[in-house]
Amino acid sequence: MAKEKYERTKPHVNIGTIGHVDHGKTTLTAAISKVLHDEYPDLNPEYDFNQIDAAPEEQQRGITINIAHIEYQTAKRHYAHVDCPGHADFVKNMITGAAQMDGAILVVAATDGPMAQTREHVLLAPQVGVPKILVALNKCDMVDDEELIELVEEEVRDLLDENGFDRDCPVVHTSAYGALHDDAPDHDKWVATIKELMDDVDEYIPTPVHDLDKPFLMPIEDVFTISGRGTVVTGRVERGKLPINTNVEIVGIRPTQTTTFTSIETFHKQMDECEAGDNTGLLLRGINRTDVERGQVVAAPGSVTPHTKFEGEVYVLTKDEGGRHSPFFSNYRPQFYFRTTDVTGVITLPEGVEMVQPGDHATFTVELIQPIAMEEGLTFAVREGGHTVGSGRVTKILA
């Protein structure tokens, strides 16, 4: 059966839910898609709540691990929504997911207020390029005292302010559970709050200006085989646009390969061309599943090159921000998280600098054990033992 064609009729915006484990991010995602389905049934498919937490181990533990993409539409826009994991071990996946957001809904339970992972996500958001955050104050049906809700709201606004976000952003008092379940008390009231939240998202999160004129680049997030057709790589197009049957290079980690892609899909719909901001699958001609991996990029030929040695400008997180408790020295070997993958690298501090303390802004040289498609200005996270300990950008490519 021929697949539906993807139509670009409305502005497309990538948003997502971030926040602490069990504060209701996935429930809110389900509530948004249900409320919008009920309001605009022609525009929005019905999603099963359990589909969002897709992997079996997640349902056993009740924790969202990988990233779930769903799509929905308001009257004004088409959205791709990423439900980001909230569990501390999975911040790595949050980084890959959050790098795909034009704005985020921070979900905070009114019963708890901001918790450790709320803080970590807000801290990471600017590093992974999330420009705007608004707030869903969830579980308001479980708090009788209006003053307590106001206190939590104030605390959330302070947290946003401390991390460079707008403290006067929209904050919606809601209950995702109440809006999702028809038999919940005050169901209609909570549905109205979800509509209010989406009106705020429409207004507050700006339509992104995608870099269509720059050379095409898509970081590879996943690779799989479609039997009889070939290898598909998926990811979000970072910049540029690409018509079908165009030559591309696969750059990074391994020697650069040239190939052509013969099909483009987004949300299971066929496209003739993909462009910046699209979540896309590309079918590559003559490439085996084992020839490509997450962490490489698909790029316009000659537009980006692989490098292992660079100078970086880095902010080192303090202990309170979840970073290291002690300084590090030359020959420190953490992981450097570029786009969608971790690569180990060796740090060399500049002459005259003996060590770098938590809380410092530092410049140092890094030599990676594998080449990464790199340009000046590329951002990265520094990670150790599963925790983010710093964030930085490439200031100068050395080799």
Swiss-Prot record:
Coiled coil: none annotated. Its EC number is 3.6.5.3. Residues 138-141 are annotated as: G4. Residues 83-86 are annotated as: G3. It is found in: Cytoplasm. GO terms for molecular function: GTP binding; GTPase activity; translation elongation factor activity. Residues 62-66 are annotated as: G2. Residues 19-26 are annotated as: G1. GTP binds at residues 19-26, 83-87, 138-141. It is an enzyme of class 3 (hydrolase). It catalyses: GTP + H2O = GDP + phosphate + H(+). Keywords: Cytoplasm, Elongation factor, GTP-binding, Hydrolase, Magnesium, Metal-binding, Nucleotide-binding, Protein biosynthesis. Monomer. Belongs to the TRAFAC class translation factor GTPase superfamily. Classic translation factor GTPase family. EF-Tu/EF-1A subfamily. This is Elongation factor Tu. It comes from Bifidobacterium animalis subsp. lactis (strain AD011).
